[in-house]
């Protein structure tokens, strides 16, 4: 088995967690769409929530069970749920579309804000878990 292969039970946990995460992302983005001027701000919001929550969960796991590594809970919630709740590819497409529409400042704010905001959100989640 190659280093990239994942046992079926682990892949199943990721898949089971991914379904509600993707569903929630779709629901939140569709709910926010009429309230915000551009669809990408819904994606921004779910990415920030997912980054915060993933930082919190990973820090709690490291604090409570540091030796467990990629535990079933991390595979289910961290990789599956929060991995599908957040979406880097949609973020990248939305930045590109904003650039194509010649909205340079908005594209810059979206790109930099997403990256820095994501880092700050993870740090806040870690801080909450450790504080």
From Swiss-Prot:
Localization in the cell: Cell inner membrane
Record text on activity regulation: Na(+) is not transported, but it plays an essential structural role and its presence is essential for fluoride channel function.
Record membrane topology: Multi-pass membrane protein
GO molecular function, one term: fluoride channel activity
Gene Ontology CC annotations of this record: plasma membrane
Main location: membrane
Entry keyword annotation includes Cell cycle: no
InterPro entries the record matches: FluC
Organism domain of life: Bacteria
UniProt-annotated binding residues for Na(+): 83, 86
Catalytic reaction list: fluoride(in) = fluoride(out)
Transmembrane parts of this sequence: 4-24, 40-60, 73-93, 108-128
Any GO BP annotation: cellular detoxification of fluoride
Signal peptide: none
Pfam families: CRCB
Sorted UniProt keywords: Cell inner membrane, Cell membrane, Ion channel, Ion transport, Membrane, Metal-binding, Sodium, Transmembrane, Transmembrane helix, Transport
Role noted for this protein: Fluoride-specific ion channel. Important for reducing fluoride concentration in the cell, thus reducing its toxicity.
Family: Belongs to the fluoride channel Fluc/FEX (TC 1.A.43) family.
Protein name: Fluoride-specific ion channel FluC 1
């Amino acid at each position: 088995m190659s280093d990239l292969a994942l046992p079926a039970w682990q892949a199943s946990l990721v898949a089971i967690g991914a379904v509600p995460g993707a569903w929630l992302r779709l629901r939140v983005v569709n709910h926010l769409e009429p309230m915000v001027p551009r669809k990408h701000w819904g994606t921004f919001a779910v990415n920030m929530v997912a980054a915060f929550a993933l930082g919190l969960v990973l820090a709690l796991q490291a604090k409570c069970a540091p030796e467990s590594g990629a535990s079933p809970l991390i595979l289910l919630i961290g990789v599956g749920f929060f991995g599908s709740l957040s979406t880097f590819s949609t973020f990248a497409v939305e930045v590109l579309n904003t650039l194509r529409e010649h909205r340079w400042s908005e594209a810059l704010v979206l790109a930099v804000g997403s990256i820095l905001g994501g880092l700050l959100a993870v740090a806040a989640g870690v801080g909450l878990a450790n504080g």
